[in-house]
């Protein structure tokens, strides 16, 4: 390639292609005065000039540098006076210039041409924005005074909006696009970058300007603003309340009518937001206070707003019929109370509900509010391992404050709240704290049926989980504590007595190690499932051979079993105790006699039954029956004779008049028969006697007692040791070692003497001398 170095008048010697190539080079290098001079040397149109500027002028060029040269025919722009003022430029030769121009499609073809300057302004401003994102340069181009009228008008409206918006977001625009832009286009560009720092500027300088310049139709303007508010509400759902908070507090140039709309959006924003953090709550409180101050609202009773459900959709919240978001003293008062309630829940370390949820709970029915209260308590206690009185007291105080706020628990009475606390404290096994708070939560004022249900539920929760039978340990001890909580609650007295006796029975039955069901260890639940007093006592006697000797323990157990089974009339305590005692004495003596332990049977009569007989005339007949039964029992016990005689004398002493002859007759015959037996035993070898003792008694049992006792009567002795019968010493025994003597004394006289003196003991008459 050959290049020519031009001299001082080199320009006029250039070929057409070299001049065009030079013109392009000058435009590219932003040398517009020189370019305008060269253009004058070429036979090109104004449209060609504008086309070359559009194509080759760098987009980053300061508009002030080329604006004077856009109108090539105007007097604006400094044209060099002479060719000498143009510095020589080294250009390619003609052939090379033509080749390069051909590649740029500027040679051997029709040059591109723009229609007019307005087209250049539009296209070059678009090119600036698309290539550099420097919208401000395009804005400077279109706002200058030399721009065509249509460009200036467009710049003052639509392009101003996009120019201002370009500070925050990329704005790909051209004249056609800007002219066709709608509020949707502006919002789609503006809202993604909207934040608390730029929201006032964007809403005031961009959104408002665009809507006002886009139409003069009031209906269209209203529709555009409705779209803005709806999109702003959607933005809150994803980005939070910060933007709305800033707008309400700092958008001071907003028109009063628009502020009412903004206030509605702000109130709706609080309900549509899913964030209930302290930060969001503080923003909501600021928003509400600002609306109250600017619109002169006051705090009022908002109860009417919570009497019906509300639509929390975006359209529902922005509806003119929605009283919840329509700016008023009612709506702002409610929102302020919700902020206080959420703050209280946050202090309790409870997950705070959203504003929407708070209203929904407050409008809900009794069951829903109870469930929410239970969740509040559970969450509040979630971080406390063993809540004490202070924890429960503070929690109860918080709930009372909620009631004062008229939120959440509107349909729950004080008693219902007390019941929830009662159940939860029982569940947490905070028995000591519950006893301390009985008056505070009004335990005694709770409905009786509810009290009983709570008692049963909590008691059996622990009782049926118990494996240990000791009432002072484990789950059984907890069951006792449940009963202790309700000690002052009169409606529960019958149930408490029965359940307390059930616990006592479990503890008393433990030492006997019963097997109630094969393969199952003894447990409180098993005792309850087999709660039949007679059956249990008999099972103890059958599985524990010596259990009948533990009379006091068995009696105590039997009493508790009857109480636990509901077979005990507390209005007649002494009657019931006597009934159970008589039954137990009968059962114990029956078992004793079955085991031929007549001595223990005698002990029961003397130590237990006679004491009862002294205190009650009604027991004497029972004493007679028992003593007579023992007296007639054919025992093989070594002291059987003495014991039986003692028992027969006790029977005589307590027999009713109609039974007295029978007992006396039996006692007389038995005593006489005993003398014959004594004589026979003394004439027999001792060892033989010992080995045959049981057989002899069996033979005696089968013999004719009347005949034997008649023979024995002849052998009755007047031994002084027999006088113990008449001295009234109930703890002494007749000796079996008396020596029988034969006397000529009339048998009738002796029997009469014995009988008379025996009755004397019964009647308190001294014996005959």
From Swiss-Prot:
Keyword set, alphabetical order: Endoplasmic reticulum, ER-Golgi transport, Membrane, Protein transport, Transport
Domain of life: Eukaryota
InterPro entries assigned to the protein according to its UniProt record, in alphabetical order: Sec39_domain (IPR013244)
Subcellular location(s) per record: Endoplasmic reticulum membrane
GO BP annotation list: intracellular protein transport; retrograde vesicle-mediated transport, Golgi to endoplasmic reticulum
Membrane topology reported for the UniProt record: Peripheral membrane protein
GO (cellular component) term, any one: nucleus
Function in brief: Required for protein transport between the Golgi and the endoplasmic reticulum. May contribute to tethering of coatomer-coated retrograde transport vesicles to the ER membrane through interaction with and stabilization of the SNARE complex.
Family according to the record: Belongs to the SEC39 family.
Assembly mode: Component of a peripheral membrane protein complex consisting of dsl1, sec39 and tip20.
Identification of the protein by name: Protein transport protein sec39
Native organism: Schizosaccharomyces pombe (strain 972 / ATCC 24843)
Gene that encodes the chain: sec39
